[in-house]
Amino acid sequence: MKELALNHLPELAPRTVESLNLLRLRLEQTAPDAKIILLTSTTPQEGKTTLALQFWQLLAGLGQRCLLVDGDLRHSGICRQCGLTGEHKVPGLAHYLSGSVPLEEVLYHTEIRGTCLVPASGTTSRPALLLEH
C-alpha cells in the first residue's frame, strides 16, 4: 500500500473535538456494532467533507483504525482539502471504478496512525456510469 502525506489538515479545535465526541458516543449508543458510517446529503456546502475529515481524525486520534473513502466523483472536497490536486493528484476511486487501476493503487496509508484514504481523484460529469459496473 502506498503512503500519502496529508499536510493540509488543520488541528481540531477543542470545541470541535467535544462536538465530535458527542456524535461518536451517540453513534456508539445507537449502533454499537456498526463499522461503517456514511455521510451524505442532496445539496452542496452542508459540511459533509469537513465533518468526514474531522470525524476521521478524531477516531484515529482515539486509536481506532479508519478508512475514509471519498465518494464525491463530481467535486471532491476531500482531495481539495487534503492538497491532492494539481501536481499532487493521485489515482483514486474514479480510476478504480473505471477499471484503469487495481484497488491497491488507490488505497493509501497516511501519516495519521491507523488511517487509510481512498481519494475520489479524477472527476466525471456522469458518476452513475462508473457505479453501474
Spans of features found by a protein language model:
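P-loop/Walker-type NTP enzyme "switch/lid" segment
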Residues: 2-25, 29-32, 40-46, 61, ...
